[in-house]
UniProtKB/Swiss-Prot annotation:
Keywords: Cytoplasm, Exonuclease, Hydrolase, Nuclease. It is an enzyme of class 3 (hydrolase). GO terms for cellular component: cytosol; exodeoxyribonuclease VII complex. It holds the Pfam family Exonuc_VII_S. The keyword Cytoplasm applies. The gene is xseB. Its EC number is 3.1.11.6. InterPro entries: Exonuc_VII_S, Exonuc_VII_ssu_sf. Heterooligomer composed of large and small subunits. GO terms for molecular function: exodeoxyribonuclease VII activity. This is Exodeoxyribonuclease 7 small subunit. GO terms for biological process: DNA catabolic process. The lineage of its organism: Bacteria, Bacillati, Bacillota, Bacilli, Bacillales.
Length: 86
């Protein structure tokens, strides 16, 4: 992968990557793709899949944190409230 392709990939949104992945899957499902082109599509699809996975992981990490009142990031945890029914 060239440096310019890598930069384009990094700037791609999750939605753009998913759309590209869906287009590739559609082309491969048609079945009228020469082997060499199918391999190229597969490689491109795996790259887009990895990009989507990385973007989702990044968002999950962001969601693990909430803003404290003083503006600092703090881990978010859910504590069960005592119901007092003991």
């Amino acid at each position: 992968m060239t440096e310019s392709n890598k930069q384009k990939e990094e700037q791609m949104t999750f939605e753009e990557a998913m759309k590209g992945l869906e287009e590739i899957v559609g082309k491969l499902e048609e079945g009228d793709v020469p082997l060499e082109q199918a391999i190229h599509y597969f490689q491109e699809g795996m790259t887009l899949s990895k990009l989507c996975h990385e973007k989702l992981q990044h968002v999950e990490k962001q969601m693990d944190f909430i803003l404290k009142e003083d503006g600092e990031l703090a881990p978010f945890s859910v504590k069960e409230a005592d119901s007092g029914d003991k």
